């Protein structure tokens, strides 16, 4: 398990709701006239999501202005706009809205006596991997999983890239996961 939790936290719900609010603020989203509706809201929602996936250090590393004397910093802003457009070109706002809504429903303990009881039933060999800079699923969430899954091991990787570290820290993840394959 990596960069996840057994149930949605209030922190995660707040991020998801902020994205839905951006979608709902777009008048074309509310009109429901076409799948292109809500495109401006989708771009904004994506920008909000990106900030939640990344970290302060990661943005400073990748989005700092090349010109230290620039009057108006825009590299990070341009990146946010680019990522919003990129998503809007391949995804529709209505699907994004319900995908964000579905995240709020995550709770493996529902109907199973709570998360601790549900986790206690896991019999598979389990390694839980936390990312030290992940703000969406902080390491305390990963440690909770490892503490309640019988025989689970906890490993932590270091990343400057927040939650997206699970996509970017390939060497560290390989070091943790590869031994499981043998």
What are these regions (language model features)?
Residues 143-144, 151-182:
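Catalytic active-site module of serine/aspartate enzymes centered on a nucleophile-bearing elbow/loop
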Residues 135-141:
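Conserved alpha/beta-hydrolase "acid-adjacent" motif
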Residues 5, 132-134:
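Residue-level signal for short, function-critical loop segments
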Residues 122, 128-130:
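Short beta-strand/loop motif that positions the catalytic acidic residue
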Residues 94-101, 175:
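Feature representing long, continuous alpha-helical segments
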Residues 119-123, 148-149:
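Short, conserved loop/helix-junction motifs that constitute active-site signature segments
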């Amino acid at each position: 398990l990596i960069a996840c939790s057994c149930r949605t936290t209030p922190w995660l719900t707040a991020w998801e709701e902020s994205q839905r609010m951006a979608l709902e603020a777009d008048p074309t989203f509310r009109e429901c006239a076409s799948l292109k509706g809500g495109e401006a809201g989708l771009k904004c929602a994506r920008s909000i999501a990106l900030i939640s996936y990344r970290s302060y250090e990661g943005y400073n590393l990748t989005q700092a202005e090349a010109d230290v004397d620039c009057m108006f910093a825009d590299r990070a802003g341009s990146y946010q706009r680019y990522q919003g457009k990129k998503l809007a070109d391949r995804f529709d706002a209505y699907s994004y809205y319900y995908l964000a809504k579905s995240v709020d429903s995550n709770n493996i303990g529902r109907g199973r006596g709570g998360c601790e009881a549900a986790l206690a039933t896991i019999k598979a060999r389990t390694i839980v991997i936390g990312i030290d800079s992940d703000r969406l699923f902080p390491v305390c969430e990963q440690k909770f999983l490892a503490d309640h899954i019988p025989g689970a091991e906890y490993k932590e990787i270091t990343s400057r890239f927040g939650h997206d570290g699970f996509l970017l820290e390939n060497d560290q993840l390989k070091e943790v996961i590869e031994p499981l394959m043998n």
